[in-house]
């Protein structure tokens, strides 16, 4: 099993961010359930970059917590490249505070959530959302975190 992380920190202030080891652990607890080897980029950004990408790719004129950009290899070519996760520091921090969650737990949840998107999971339809949230809860609890959706239940 090999999950290769390319961590990019595109923020003005790197203090208080999860460590590369934290992010690697979260990926190692998520991805191997679905595929043995993977390579992905996790880019932590400030509000401006998140806002710009969310507007350009999703038509939403605001920053968001996590954006997932799956990589699709051309037909006949097999690569372990999953894609890119773009996580907005300020949105994650604000959500953690608003939801009274430990900040590290919310960072972990965003990495798990985004990774599942890269693996093909979605939450547009209710049944898809239920399956994805169930997986997220299971993975988060396996790492010692609370159910990230506990406030919604």
Curated annotation (Swiss-Prot):
Q: Which SUPFAM superfamilies match?
A: Metalloproteases ('zincins'), catalytic domain
What domain of life does the native source organism fall in?
A: Bacteria
| EC identifiers of the protein | 3.1.-.-
Q: Which residues bind Zn(2+)?
A: 113, 117, 123
Sorted keywords for this record are: Cytoplasm, Endonuclease, Hydrolase, Metal-binding, Nuclease, Ribosome biogenesis, rRNA processing, Zinc
Q: Name one GO biological process term.
A: rRNA processing
* Matches recorded under Gene3D superfamilies: Metalloproteases ('zincins'), catalytic domain
Identify which cofactors the protein needs according to its UniProt entry: Zn(2+)
Where does the record locate the signal sequence feature? none
Gene Ontology molecular function: any one: RNA endonuclease activity
Explain how, and how many, cofactor molecules are bound: Binds 1 zinc ion.
Give the protein's biological function: Single strand-specific metallo-endoribonuclease involved in late-stage 70S ribosome quality control and in maturation of the 3' terminus of the 16S rRNA.
The entry sums up its family as follows:
Belongs to the endoribonuclease YbeY family.
Q: What is this protein called?
A: Endoribonuclease YbeY
Gene this chain is encoded by: ybeY
């Amino acid at each position: 099993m090999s999950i290769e992380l390319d961590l990019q920190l595109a923020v003005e202030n790197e203090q208080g961010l999860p460590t590369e080891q934290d992010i690697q652990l979260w990926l190692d607890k998520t991805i191997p359930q679905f595929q043995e080897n993977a390579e992905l980029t996790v880019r932590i950004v400030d509000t401006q970059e998140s806002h710009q990408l969310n507007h350009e790719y999703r038509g939403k004129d605001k920053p968001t917590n996590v954006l997932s950009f799956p990589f699709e290899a051309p037909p006949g070519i097999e690569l372990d490249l999953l894609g890119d996760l773009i996580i907005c520091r300020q949105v994650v921090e604000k959500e953690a505070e608003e939801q009274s969650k430990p900040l590290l737990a919310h960072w972990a949840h965003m990495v798990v959530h985004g990774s599942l998107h890269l693996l093909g999971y979605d939450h547009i339809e209710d049944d898809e959302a239920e399956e994805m949230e169930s997986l997220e809860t299971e993975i988060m609890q396996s790492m010692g975190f609370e159910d990230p959706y506990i406030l919604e239940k």
